[in-house]
C-alpha cells in the first residue's frame, strides 16, 4: 500500500493504513470489532457472555476489517482492487425456469448487488433460494464459489447446478481436493476455515454465494471472511437472526439484507399433537446437571425417552397407520439409537421391508439418495435442520422434544399446490416440565403460522380424558381427521389426488417383539 493511501479493498477485506488514521479511530475500530457472543441460559434470567474474539487482523502498519463495516466507519476506500479487477467471463446460462415470485426476488437482488456489491437473501424453507442464487450467478457470468456447511448440501447444490444450467462440470474445494477452474465451484466452509489454501486459487472468483449464511456468525466460520472476498457476495438463508447476537458479523462482511420474507402462514398444515403420559416415572422424571435444579439436563432426559418401551411402540403404531394411508413420512429424532431401533423393526417386517430408509450424518451420498426414495424416512434433526430437499414428503413426526422446529417442519412445505394436507405429528411428553416448556415454544410457532392444531391425549394407563396408547382404532380415527377448509383461497391450494391410497398389507406384531425395557 502506497504511503499516501489510507484505505483500500482487497480479497482479504477492507485494509486500513494505521499511520494515516488517528489513534482514537483505530481504538474505536478495535473496540467495535472485538465481538462478544451471548449465550442463552434457558434457566436463568440473564444472558451469559462468552469470551470475545476479534474480527480485525493486524499486520504491521495495516489492519484488515470487514468490508461493510469499513464502508460505514471510514467511507469509500481510496482503491478498490476487487471491483476493478477484470474477472474472466464464464459460459453460464440458466436453463431452468423460475416461478414469477422467484423472478421478482432475483431481479431485486441483482439490482441490490449491482449497487452495493453484496447482501443477504432471506426466504422461507422450500422457497427456492438455491435456484434463485444459481440464476443470479448465471446473470453475472462470473466464476462463482458456492460455500456450504454439509456434505449432502454440497451434492445437492451440484445437482441443482447441473440440472438448471448449461454447466455440467462443477469444481470442488474440500480438504486436499482443489478443482477450481470451472464456472461453478462448491466448497465446504470447514475446509476454508481450517486450511490456508494458495491465495491465487480465489483471485478469479467474481461471486461468492454462502448457503445457510446465518452460520457464518460463529467464531470458527467467520475466519473464512478474512481469507476470501469477491466483487459480489451473496448470503442465502431462512434465518435472519442469531441468538448469540452475532448476525452483525454477517452484515459487516456480506452486506445488508436485500430481501426478507418469512415462512408464509399456511392454513393447509395440520398439527396433530399427542399429549403423551407415561407410566415409566423413572425415565420421564426431571434430571439435573450436577444436582443444580436451575439446570435441567435436557440431553439426559431426551436419551431417557428412548428407553420408554411403550412410547416407542406408540410411535410405531403412528408410522404403520400413516404408511397404510399412503403418506410419505419423515420421522425425526435427536437420538440415533431410536432411529436404529425403528429402522430394524420396520425393515425386518414383511409389510414395510424395503420401504424404510435412514437419513443421518456420515452416510454416503449414494445411500442418502436411496433413502430419499423410500416411503418412510428415519432421520436426525441435524440432517433435516437445513437444506434437506426431498420431494413428496407430506408428514413429519417429531420423535423427540425440540424447541426450534421451523426448519424441520419446512421439509414438508415445498409446494405451491398441495394434493393433501401436510401433517405435523408433535408428541408432547406431559410428565416432564422441561418438555412441556419446549412444547409451548412450538405452539407459538404453529399459531404464528396459522397451522390447524388438533389435540389428543394418550396415556399408558387408565386416566380420565386420556385414551390408551395401544388403542389402534382410536389412532387410526384421529390420524384421518381433518379440519374444515376455511376459505376459497385455501381450497385453491389443494387439489384432489387421482391416485388411490396405497393399502398397508398388515400390522407389525410388535407385541411379540422383546425390545428395550419396560416399567
From Swiss-Prot:
Keywords: ATP-binding, Helicase, Hydrolase, Nucleotide-binding
Catalytic activity entry: ATP + H2O = ADP + phosphate + H(+)
Record's keyword annotation contains Signal: no
Residue positions of motif DEAH box: 211-214
Matches recorded under PROSITE patterns: HELICASE_ATP_BIND_1, HELICASE_CTER
Domain Helicase C-terminal: from-to ranges: 317-457
EC number: 3.6.4.13
Example of a GO MF term: ATP binding
Catalytic EC class: hydrolase
Domain Helicase ATP-binding: 110-258
Keyword check for ATP-binding: yes
Membrane spanning residue stretches: none
Positions bound to ATP: 123-130
Protein family per UniProt: Belongs to the DEAD box helicase family. DEAH subfamily.
Protein name listed in UniProt: Putative ATP-dependent RNA helicase L396
Naturally occurring in which organism (per UniProt): Acanthamoeba polyphaga mimivirus
Source species taxonomy: Viruses, Varidnaviria, Bamfordvirae, Nucleocytoviricota, Megaviricetes
